[in-house]
Amino acid sequence: MPQTPSTRWCPTPEQLMILEEMYRSGVRTPNAAEIQQITAHLAYYGRIEGKNVFYWFQNHKARERQRLRRRLCARHQQQYAQQQQQATAAAPASSPNSSATLLAPPAAGGSSAPCVHPAVMQLHHHHHPYATSFSMPHLGYLGQQAATVTPVLNPAAAGMVDLAGAGAGNRATGAGGAYGGGAGLYNSCSSNQLEVWDATEPMDHCNASCGAASGSSDEGGAAHLQLPACCRRPLKTLDLFPTKSTGLKDECSSSKSSSCSTSTN
């Protein structure tokens, strides 16, 4: 049985070399006339048809696009891997700085610490003597004025109550246990400080110091930091621990004498 010749085109090395040279020279999609000229020229080196030339250029362009696509994908993957490595290397280095920034206290001269008038805080301490250990928003201001401002004494000292001379040491100690150690703060103040203290001096001194700190003149600072009428009232200290006897013995003796007189009658 005779074998039919194959219709598949098998290009010779000379034909492939000529086609590749033409492709490198810039020929990508030849028209019909160019295909006929190329086919006639390549027919000297072997069997070839016009459709073989057309499909060779089409397949060669497709292979080149695939190669370019693979190169671009490999380049993008390499760049992405490098970016990931840089991000992972920079994350541990920046985490201590961020934690230190979060835990760092605000600067002493920064605007984050509110400036509260010491006289207003004195009035707050007078009405809330046991809230000082929980909220102290004016620590930054007091830290700056510690060298010039006289420390605010306890509300009991503002009323010039002489606890040591009044014979109420035992009663103050007992009340200190009930009020969370308040008597310990009272006993820490010396008797000389209690006697020298004047209730009007802290107000004037605070106005002068705050006026100087704000950079204004004496008159401008006093006018700017003038307190309302409720804060200019003199402080009053409640008589929590009475210093005088209640006269129970006299009342008992008088009641006994009256009962005896009624019984004799």
From Swiss-Prot:
Ranges of compositional bias, category Low complexity: 254-265
Entry keywords, A to Z: Developmental protein, DNA-binding, Homeobox, Nucleus, Transcription, Transcription regulation
Highest taxon of source: Eukaryota
Pfam families (alphabetical): Homeodomain (PF00046)
Cited PROSITE patterns: HOMEOBOX_2
Function of the protein: Probable transcription factor required to initiate organ founder cells in a lateral domain of shoot meristems. Involved in leaf formation.
Stated name of the protein: WUSCHEL-related homeobox 3B
Organism (species): Zea mays
Lineage of origin: Eukaryota, Viridiplantae, Streptophyta, Embryophyta, Tracheophyta
Gene for this chain: WOX3B
